[in-house]
Each structure stands twice: as structure tokens, then as C-alpha cells.
């Protein structure tokens, strides 16, 4: 399997705000406190069969971790971390245990995927949970306007198929929003300003990594600029 050079960081979602770009247009952004992360393990094809780097984020009292975890951190020569994540990347050999990573690993304009735990919505019906249309508002429909309708025939198939979309608990699940653009990087405060919304509540843990799907070249090519007195030929 072909693996590219990826960049990634664990961070905390601080909330949303809006900023202005160079053209004085309002841009909605999510502020992420990215890192600092520390490299806790480096995996290579020779020792582990694949290339990856393990990152740790957030302090934790050493008394609150078990002996295997304590030994794992001691081997890397770092203090215990609350959260761990593995980033598969082809250039894992360029990392070393104990190395600290900050938001500087990303540049302005980088396309990223952001993973987090979505907000819990509680028990929800099929219209909210799955986007069902529901039944009619009139024409003899009685107290069944938001019901899913038939879930299966009584004789054929005589059962309810597995995986049928029904009402149930909604949200509080691992969710990834792909193809977001980093609007700005604040290296002094360690902030990433990501254009658009990301999963999870304020204060939630998020993982920012290089986009798995590369954008089309024409989507990222810089616009041509025309100087004073120049004309654009068709």
C-alpha cells in the first residue's frame, strides 16, 4: 500500500469565530489549540512491518496510569501523556522519540482532515437521525407523521433486515470532516485557524492530519495576477 508523507497533531477545539481575509471577506474559522505533541514511539517496516509515528498529547498524573503504560513512556524518555494517536506516514524515520511538535508542522493553505467525537443528540427519530421525509401531513395520516413507515413485509421477507435505519441514539461518535483548509497558523499561541466547522463540542479532543484525498490541481493553483496596464488575452 502506497503511503505518503503525512503531518498530524492532536489538539483541543476552542470554538468558532470569524476573521477577514485579504479581500475583506468574512471567513468563519474554528480555533484549535494544536499541541504541543511529543513523539512517544517510532515504528519502522523493519521492526513493526509498517511506517508510523505515535504522538502523545496532554499531561496526566503518573499515578493514574498502569505499569505497562508507565514503562512505555519511560522507554521513550517522556512524561506520561493523556492521549495517544498513531499517524501512518512514509517519513517516520525522520522523527525521534521525545521530539516535540507544534502547529508549525502545518502551513497556511494546507488541506487537512479533522477527526473528533461529534456532539451527542440523545435518542432521535428517523427524520432527524437519517433525514427521512416522514409520512404525509394529511390525507388520512393519523399520529404517524414522523414514523419511518414499513420496516418489512409480514410474510415476505417475514423479518426485519439487519442494518435497517431506525430511531436510536444519535451522535457521540467518531466523525471526520475532510478537505478543510487551514486559514492561518498562530505560532506564538499555538493556534490553528481552520476554515469551517469541525466535529465535537468546545474543549473536545481533535486530530488534525494531512488530507487523505489530495485536492484537484486546478483547485489549489494560485490565481494569475495582472499588473497595471496589462491586458489578459483570451
Swiss-Prot record:
Residues 137-156 are annotated as: Disordered. This is Large ribosomal subunit protein uL3. One of its GO terms (cellular component) is cytosolic large ribosomal subunit. InterPro entries: Ribosomal_uL3, Ribosomal_uL3_bac/org-type, Ribosomal_uL3_CS, Transl_B-barrel_sf. GO terms for biological process: translation. The lineage of its organism: Bacteria, Bacillati, Actinomycetota, Actinomycetes, Frankiales. Part of the 50S ribosomal subunit. Forms a cluster with proteins L14 and L19. Belongs to the universal ribosomal protein uL3 family. PROSITE patterns: RIBOSOMAL_L3. One of its GO terms (molecular function) is structural constituent of ribosome. The keyword Ribonucleoprotein applies. One of the primary rRNA binding proteins, it binds directly near the 3'-end of the 23S rRNA, where it nucleates assembly of the 50S subunit. It comes from the Bacteria. Keywords: Ribonucleoprotein, Ribosomal protein, RNA-binding, rRNA-binding. HAMAP family: Ribosomal_uL3_B (MF_01325_B). The keyword rRNA-binding applies.
Amino acid at each position: 500500500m502506497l503511503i505518503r508523507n503525512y503531518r498530524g497533531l492532536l489538539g483541543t477545539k476552542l470554538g468558532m469565530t470569524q476573521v477577514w481575509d485579504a479581500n475583506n471577506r468574512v471567513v468563519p474559522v474554528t480555533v484549535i489549540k494544536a499541541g504541543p505533541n511529543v513523539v512517544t514511539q517510532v515504528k519502522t517496516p523493519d521492526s513493526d512491518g509498517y511506517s508510523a509515528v505515535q504522538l502523545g498529547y496532554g499531561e496526566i498524573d503518573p499515578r493514574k496510569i498502569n505499569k505497562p503504560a508507565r514503562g512505555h513512556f519511560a522507554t521513550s524518555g517522556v512524561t506520561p501523556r493523556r492521549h495517544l494517536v498513531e499517524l501512518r506516514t512514509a517519513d517516520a524515520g525522520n522523527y525521534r522519540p521525545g521530539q516535540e511538535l507544534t502547529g508549525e508542522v502545518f502551513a497556511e493553505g494546507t488541506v487537512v482532515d479533522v477527526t473528533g467525537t461529534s456532539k451527542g443528540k440523545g435518542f432521535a427519530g428517523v427524520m432527524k437521525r437519517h433525514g427521512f421525509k416522514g409520512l404525509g401531513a394529511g390525507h388520512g395520516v393519523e399520529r404517524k407523521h414522523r414514523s419511518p413507515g414499513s420496516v418489512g413485509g409480514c410474510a415476505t421477507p417475514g423479518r426485519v433486515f439487519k442494518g435497517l435505519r431506525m430511531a436510536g441514539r444519535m451522535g457521540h461518535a467518531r466523525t471526520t470532516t475532510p478537505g478543510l483548509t487551514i486559514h492561518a497558523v498562530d505560532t506564538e499561541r499555538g493556534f490553528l485557524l481552520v476554515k469551517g466547522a469541525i466535529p465535537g463540542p468546545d474543549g473536545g479532543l481533535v486530530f488534525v492530519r494531512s488530507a487523505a484525498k489530495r485536492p484537484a490541481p486546478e483547485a489549489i493553483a494560485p490565481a494569475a495576477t495582472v499588473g497595471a496596464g496589462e491586458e489578459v488575452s483570451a
